[in-house]
């Protein structure tokens, strides 16, 4: 048992497996960031994969990953497959979130405001940023803890998106 713990500990914070992988997203409905669409579990059951990024304006690693998320949101290959990127602002204020997205670009098709962190808890989020890949049927396919990067996306998310959309 101690050996298993040490192996898991050595994998770092980005490896904590989620008990929700392979299960439907929790039921939720979040109010919208002003000027955007709100977000609910129904929005994640569109028949196409959705990338859900939990972030906050006060999170340093969220600012680190932000330029890559903006780049990802403009990827013509993902757009052709109908993949959307949506955000959940965790325990943040509307004006701070708008300021962050205004300064760095807005990669999100929709942003839900999780003011009390309840939806984040329901998703098993324990530290932001965290990013989930949701299948078109609303089933959680993958989770990444920490800043999203081209390497992580290519290794962890891209193959699952290809499989979910029947392409390469």
Features from the language model and the residues they span:
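A generic structural signal for alpha->beta connector loops
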Residues: 27, 82, 108-109
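A short beta-strand-turn-helix
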Residues: 28-51
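Short pre-active-site segment immediately N-terminal to redox-active cysteine/selenocysteine motifs
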Residues: 47-50, 55-58, 127
């Amino acid at each position: 048992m101690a050996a298993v713990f040490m192996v898991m500990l050595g994998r770092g914070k980005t490896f904590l497996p989620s008990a929700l992988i392979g299960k439907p997203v929790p039921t939720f409905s979040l109010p919208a960031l002003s000027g955007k669409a709100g977000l609910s579990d129904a929005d994640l059951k569109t028949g196409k994969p959705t990338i859900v990024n939990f972030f906050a304006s006060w999170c340093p690693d969220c600012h680190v990953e932000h330029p890559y998320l903006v780049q990802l949101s403009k990827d013509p290959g993902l757009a052709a497959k109908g993949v959307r990127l949506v955000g959940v602002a965790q325990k943040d204020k509307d004006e701070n979130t708008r300021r962050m997205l205004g300064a760095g670009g807005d990669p999100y098709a929709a942003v839900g405001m999780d003011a009390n962190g309840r939806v984040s808890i329901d998703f098993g989020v324990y530290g932001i940023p965290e990013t989930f890949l949701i299948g078109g049927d609303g089933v959680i396919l993958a989770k990444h803890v920490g800043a999203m990067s081209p390497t992580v996306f290519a290794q962890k998310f891209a193959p699952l998106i290809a499989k979910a959309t029947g392409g390469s």
